[in-house]
Regions:
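Core SAM-dependent methyltransferase catalytic element
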Residues: 248-279
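Short amphipathic alpha-helix with an adjacent loop that forms part of the alpha/beta core around
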Residues: 142-152
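Rossmann-like AdoMet
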Residues: 1-89, 93-136
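A short, conserved alpha-helix within the catalytic core of class I
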Residues: 165-178
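Short alpha-helix
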Residues: 213-239
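Conserved beta-strand signature within the Rossmann-like core of class I S-adenosyl-L-methionine
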Residues: 156, 178-194
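Conserved catalytic loop of SAM-dependent methyltransferase domains
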Residues: 231-257
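Short, glycine-/aromatic-enriched active-site segment of Class I SAM-dependent methyltransferases
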Residues: 197-213
């Protein structure tokens, strides 16, 4: 298979940065991170690993990325316990394979992203039973019609590292429409405070020479999200780094101290939104 070349400074590069991070985490801690697919996928991608990605900041970033995927998988598994036939929808999927970690043999997966990302996904991952890849712009709500939603079965959406790049008014419109269209569903995504967006630009995006990409959306008060729509039943913020399981001592004292600060300060959050029941 010819390797897919990822050009630096593009949105497509965001496909590979978390992929490489999860690979690093898997290489170091194979007993606690379960994304075995990332190691295989990365062997088929042509990508220049920067010194920053392979250094200390890269190590911290890899742990954060792998932990984020663990968090998303945890929320999906919990939802599937009560809704075993639910749709599991990966918003801005890139090369993420979270569904393969939570698949119970009955749920149905939908992976959504821009056409070029879906093309790369199709080439590297191919089709799997009960998985559908949809090329779309999330802001074009016509993708709703491509989801075979059955209210009695339920639906859970997750988005990893996606909404930072959306303008707040677009996020509000999307969330409100989703809550109305998919009653009793659930949405989980990661977020930061407004102050955290500046750190993202300085440390991560510009550090990886992704200078043409901007970030907009942040969450300083999760209660604001609930007020966006009467179809949103609840919204809560959980710790990103130790909200779903304890930190591992092997990460190191300093790293864990930094992670605890990021959670406590809400610089790193996992947001869970429950959509109201119909009627």
């Amino acid at each position: 298979m010819e390797k897919i070349k990822i050009e630096p400074g593009t949105v497509q590069e965001t496909l590979v940065i978390p992929l490489y991070g999860r690979k690093q985490a898997m290489d170091r801690y194979p007993d606690i991170f379960m994304d075995h697919d990332c190691q295989e996928i990365f062997s088929h991608v042509s990508f220049q690993v920067s010194d920053q990605m392979s250094g200390k900041i890269g190590k911290i970033g890899s742990l954060m990325g792998a932990t984020r995927q663990f968090d998303m998988a945890s929320v999906c598994r919990t939802y599937l316990k009560d809704h075993p036939k639910a749709c599991v929808v990966n918003l801005g999927c890139g090369l993420d394979t979270t569904f393969r970690q939570v698949d119970n043999g009955h749920a149905r997966a939908y992976n959504l992203d821009f056409p070029d990302a879906i093309a790369a996904r199709n080439e590297l991952l191919g089709d799997r039973e009960r998985e559908t890849n949809i090329a779309c712009d999330l802001n074009d709500l016509s993708w709703f019609e491509q989801i075979d939603f059955r209210p009695e079965d339920g639906i859970v959406f997750f988005a990893s590292g996606v909404f930072y790049y959306f303008k707040t008014e677009d996020v509000k419109r999307l969330f409100s429409a989703m809550a109305e269209r998919f009653p009793s569903g659930k949405l989980v995504f990661d977020a930061t405070k407004k102050k955290g967006l500046k750190s993202m630009l300085k440390v991560w995006l510009k550090g990886f020479e992704m200078k043409d990409i901007s970030v907009y959306f942040s969450v300083d008060d999760v209660a604001v999200l609930k007020g966006w729509s009467s179809h949103i039943a609840s919204a809560q913020s959980n710790g990103y780094l130790e909200g779903y399981r304890p930190l591992d001592k092997r990460f190191g004292f300093i790293t864990n101290m930094v992670f605890r600060h990021l959670d406590k300060s809400k610089m790193c959050q996992i947001i869970e939104i429950d959509f109201a029941k119909k009627g």
